[in-house]
Amino acid sequence: MALSERLKKFKIVRKILYAIIGMVSYPGFMWVNKLTISGTENIKGLPKENVLFVCNHQTYFADVITLLHIFCAVKWGKENKLGVPYYLLNPFTNVYYVAAEETMKSSWLSKLFTMAGALTVKRTWNSKSTEKRRGLDPSDTRKIQRALEKNWVIQFPQGTTTPFAPGRKGTAHLIKMNRPIVIPVIIDGFSTAFNKQGLKFNKRGTRLSVQFKESLPVNYDAPAEEILDQVMTAIGQKRL
């Protein structure tokens, strides 16, 4: 097991990383750009385990960092705002996020983000290879399932930052197998404000928005295609 994989299991390591990443990123969300948040009443009071957040995807890192900020703020009793980031003194760390393995190995910074709670999975398709897999590797699926047992998990069903890309059935199968509470999240403005990695500014003064919707009334026994269609509609990514 890689060092980063071992370290992220220690909450104190993740708390320190959250505090550092949070302080560095906060000005970009709140001062350089303008973040608006809605729907945090839908995540307040959720259990600390078996909650799956499904979200559209606009940048590699800024999306996730923003969600982590919000989760920490909600833990401290804030509603639909970040306010002064004193929540970073004791951040909420019962959360993991699914990320492509190749992305998280691409630089020292991405390896640092891995220790903040990344569940690295192999892409179902790699632009540098002719190989195309039909779904998640079984070991990747088990990794996400284990995380859900005691934590929240953030997943991007499209697996890409391309808008209106089709969703992956792996998300639906995960929902069928684990029967989590499913919270749809819609984000906007991040692809305008930041570069693809989400680490550099493209356009300052951009309105960033994050909306948490009510939990999906999922029929866990429905076909995977039906569940996936429900998820994609909820996150505003179904082509009409």
Kindly give the residue locations of the regions a language model identified.
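Catalytic core of membrane glycerolipid acyltransferases/transacylases, capturing the structured
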Residues: 47-131
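Internal catalytic-core helix/loop-beta-alpha segment
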Residues: 118-164
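Short, flexible loop segments at the rims of nucleotide/cofactor-binding pockets, characterized by
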Residues: 14, 28-34, 98, 129-135, ...
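C-terminal alpha-helix
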Residues: 147, 230, 234-238
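A cross-family acyltransferase "interaction/gating" segment
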Residues: 149-154, 159-226
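Short amphipathic alpha-helix with an adjacent loop that forms part of the alpha/beta core around
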Residues: 41-47, 144-146
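Amphipathic coiled-coil/heptad-repeat helices and related helical stalk/stem segments
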Residues: 36-39, 105, 137-141, 167-171
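A transmembrane-helix-recognition feature enriched in membrane-embedded lipid enzymes
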Residues: 2-39, 66, 107-116
